[in-house]
A protein has these predicted regions:
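N-terminal binding-site loop/beta-alpha segment at the start of enzyme catalytic domains
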Residues: 1-69
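Hydrophobic faces of well-ordered beta-strands that scaffold small-molecule active sites
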Residues: 2-8, 50-52, 75-80, 110-112, ...
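Alpha-helix-loop-beta-strand connector modules within alpha/beta enzyme cores
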Residues: 29-36, 57-85, 128-143
Length: 168
Protein backbone atom coordinates (compact mmCIF):
# COMPACT_ATOMS: atom_id res chain seq x y z
CA UNK A 1 0.00 0.00 0.00
CA UNK A 2 1.21 3.49 -0.74
CA UNK A 3 1.43 6.03 2.06
CA UNK A 4 -1.07 8.19 0.19
CA UNK A 5 -4.45 6.94 -1.03
CA UNK A 6 -6.69 8.52 -3.66
CA UNK A 7 -9.96 9.41 -1.94
CA UNK A 8 -13.01 9.74 -4.15
CA UNK A 9 -15.50 11.74 -2.06
CA UNK A 10 -14.75 14.91 -3.99
CA UNK A 11 -14.58 13.11 -7.34
CA UNK A 12 -17.94 11.44 -6.67
CA UNK A 13 -19.68 14.67 -5.71
CA UNK A 14 -19.59 14.43 -1.92
CA UNK A 15 -18.13 17.83 -1.04
CA UNK A 16 -19.72 17.94 2.42
CA UNK A 17 -20.17 21.65 1.73
CA UNK A 18 -23.32 22.35 -0.28
CA UNK A 19 -25.69 20.92 -2.86
CA UNK A 20 -24.34 23.43 -5.37
CA UNK A 21 -20.77 22.20 -4.84
CA UNK A 22 -21.91 18.59 -5.16
CA UNK A 23 -23.70 19.34 -8.44
CA UNK A 24 -20.69 21.23 -9.81
CA UNK A 25 -18.37 18.33 -8.94
CA UNK A 26 -20.68 15.74 -10.54
CA UNK A 27 -20.94 17.92 -13.65
CA UNK A 28 -17.16 18.30 -13.82
CA UNK A 29 -16.61 14.56 -13.42
CA UNK A 30 -19.62 13.24 -15.30
CA UNK A 31 -17.57 10.85 -17.44
CA UNK A 32 -15.05 8.12 -16.62
CA UNK A 33 -12.51 9.94 -18.83
CA UNK A 34 -12.31 13.01 -16.59
CA UNK A 35 -11.90 10.81 -13.50
CA UNK A 36 -9.34 8.62 -15.26
CA UNK A 37 -7.12 11.66 -15.87
CA UNK A 38 -7.01 12.27 -12.11
CA UNK A 39 -6.10 8.63 -11.44
CA UNK A 40 -3.43 8.73 -14.14
CA UNK A 41 -1.77 11.74 -12.51
CA UNK A 42 -1.66 9.92 -9.17
CA UNK A 43 -0.24 6.79 -10.84
CA UNK A 44 2.50 8.95 -12.37
CA UNK A 45 3.73 9.42 -8.79
CA UNK A 46 3.14 5.77 -7.76
CA UNK A 47 0.06 6.55 -5.68
CA UNK A 48 -1.72 3.36 -6.65
CA UNK A 49 -4.59 2.83 -4.21
CA UNK A 50 -8.07 4.28 -4.61
CA UNK A 51 -10.80 4.43 -1.93
CA UNK A 52 -14.40 5.06 -2.89
CA UNK A 53 -18.03 4.06 -3.03
CA UNK A 54 -17.76 2.02 -6.21
CA UNK A 55 -21.37 0.82 -6.03
CA UNK A 56 -22.64 4.41 -5.88
CA UNK A 57 -20.42 6.23 -8.39
CA UNK A 58 -20.68 4.28 -11.62
CA UNK A 59 -17.79 6.26 -13.17
CA UNK A 60 -15.17 4.95 -10.76
CA UNK A 61 -14.63 1.43 -12.15
CA UNK A 62 -14.51 2.50 -15.80
CA UNK A 63 -12.11 5.29 -14.77
CA UNK A 64 -9.89 2.78 -12.94
CA UNK A 65 -9.85 0.57 -16.04
CA UNK A 66 -9.02 3.50 -18.34
CA UNK A 67 -6.22 4.72 -16.06
CA UNK A 68 -4.74 1.23 -15.87
CA UNK A 69 -4.90 0.86 -19.67
CA UNK A 70 -3.31 4.28 -20.27
CA UNK A 71 -0.49 3.87 -17.72
CA UNK A 72 0.10 0.12 -17.64
CA UNK A 73 -0.06 0.36 -13.84
CA UNK A 74 -2.55 -1.34 -11.53
CA UNK A 75 -4.70 0.45 -8.97
CA UNK A 76 -5.47 -1.21 -5.64
CA UNK A 77 -9.22 -0.89 -5.10
CA UNK A 78 -10.52 -0.17 -1.62
CA UNK A 79 -14.30 -0.39 -1.81
CA UNK A 80 -16.72 1.10 0.73
CA UNK A 81 -20.00 -0.75 0.27
CA UNK A 82 -23.26 0.41 1.74
CA UNK A 83 -24.56 -2.71 3.46
CA UNK A 84 -27.92 -3.48 5.05
CA UNK A 85 -27.14 -4.15 8.73
CA UNK A 86 -30.69 -4.94 9.83
CA UNK A 87 -30.76 -8.06 11.99
CA UNK A 88 -32.76 -10.26 9.62
CA UNK A 89 -31.83 -13.16 7.33
CA UNK A 90 -32.90 -11.13 4.27
CA UNK A 91 -30.70 -8.18 5.30
CA UNK A 92 -27.71 -10.47 5.83
CA UNK A 93 -28.18 -11.92 2.35
CA UNK A 94 -28.38 -8.40 0.93
CA UNK A 95 -25.20 -7.43 2.80
CA UNK A 96 -23.43 -10.57 1.62
CA UNK A 97 -24.33 -9.76 -1.99
CA UNK A 98 -23.06 -6.17 -1.62
CA UNK A 99 -19.78 -7.53 -0.23
CA UNK A 100 -19.48 -10.13 -2.99
CA UNK A 101 -20.08 -7.36 -5.54
CA UNK A 102 -17.02 -5.57 -4.14
CA UNK A 103 -14.93 -8.68 -4.83
CA UNK A 104 -16.38 -8.93 -8.35
CA UNK A 105 -15.29 -5.34 -8.98
CA UNK A 106 -11.76 -6.35 -8.04
CA UNK A 107 -11.50 -4.81 -4.58
CA UNK A 108 -8.56 -5.97 -2.47
CA UNK A 109 -9.87 -4.28 0.66
CA UNK A 110 -13.52 -4.00 1.69
CA UNK A 111 -14.46 -1.33 4.25
CA UNK A 112 -18.20 -1.13 4.97
CA UNK A 113 -19.25 2.52 4.96
CA UNK A 114 -19.13 4.30 8.31
CA UNK A 115 -22.86 5.06 8.31
CA UNK A 116 -23.58 1.32 8.24
CA UNK A 117 -21.00 0.36 10.85
CA UNK A 118 -22.09 3.13 13.23
CA UNK A 119 -25.58 1.60 13.38
CA UNK A 120 -24.03 -1.47 15.04
CA UNK A 121 -22.06 0.45 17.67
CA UNK A 122 -23.05 -0.14 21.31
CA UNK A 123 -21.37 2.35 23.62
CA UNK A 124 -22.75 0.65 26.72
CA UNK A 125 -21.05 -2.69 26.00
CA UNK A 126 -18.19 -1.21 23.95
CA UNK A 127 -18.95 -3.60 21.11
CA UNK A 128 -19.91 -3.42 17.47
CA UNK A 129 -22.85 -5.80 17.31
CA UNK A 130 -22.74 -8.44 14.55
CA UNK A 131 -19.59 -6.93 13.05
CA UNK A 132 -17.76 -10.29 13.06
CA UNK A 133 -20.46 -11.68 10.74
CA UNK A 134 -19.75 -8.99 8.13
CA UNK A 135 -15.99 -9.30 8.53
CA UNK A 136 -16.30 -13.04 7.91
CA UNK A 137 -18.32 -12.33 4.75
CA UNK A 138 -15.49 -10.08 3.56
CA UNK A 139 -12.86 -12.78 4.23
CA UNK A 140 -15.02 -15.42 2.52
CA UNK A 141 -15.19 -13.16 -0.55
CA UNK A 142 -11.37 -13.09 -0.63
CA UNK A 143 -10.80 -9.52 0.53
CA UNK A 144 -9.04 -7.85 3.43
CA UNK A 145 -11.52 -6.48 5.99
CA UNK A 146 -11.34 -2.87 7.05
CA UNK A 147 -13.71 -0.30 8.51
CA UNK A 148 -14.63 3.14 7.28
CA UNK A 149 -14.80 5.18 10.48
CA UNK A 150 -15.86 8.70 11.34
CA UNK A 151 -16.45 7.91 15.02
CA UNK A 152 -13.35 7.18 17.13
CA UNK A 153 -15.30 4.48 18.98
CA UNK A 154 -15.39 2.36 15.83
CA UNK A 155 -11.60 2.05 15.89
CA UNK A 156 -11.41 1.79 19.68
CA UNK A 157 -14.03 -0.97 20.01
CA UNK A 158 -12.75 -2.92 17.02
CA UNK A 159 -9.25 -2.95 18.51
CA UNK A 160 -10.47 -3.56 22.07
CA UNK A 161 -12.53 -6.58 20.99
CA UNK A 162 -9.83 -7.82 18.60
CA UNK A 163 -12.23 -7.95 15.67
CA UNK A 164 -10.71 -9.19 12.41
CA UNK A 165 -10.07 -5.68 11.06
CA UNK A 166 -6.80 -4.95 9.28
CA UNK A 167 -7.21 -1.28 8.39
CA UNK A 168 -9.25 1.84 9.07
Amino acid sequence: MPRLIIGCNWISGFSHMSDANDKWIRMTHETPTSVSKIFEKFLEYDVDAVLGLFSVDKNLMPAVQLAQEHTGKKLIIIDEPIINVDDTPAARQEAKKAIQDCAKRGASICMPLHSCVEQLLNKNTKTINRLPDYLEMIREAGMIPGLSAHMPEVVQYADYNEYDVETY
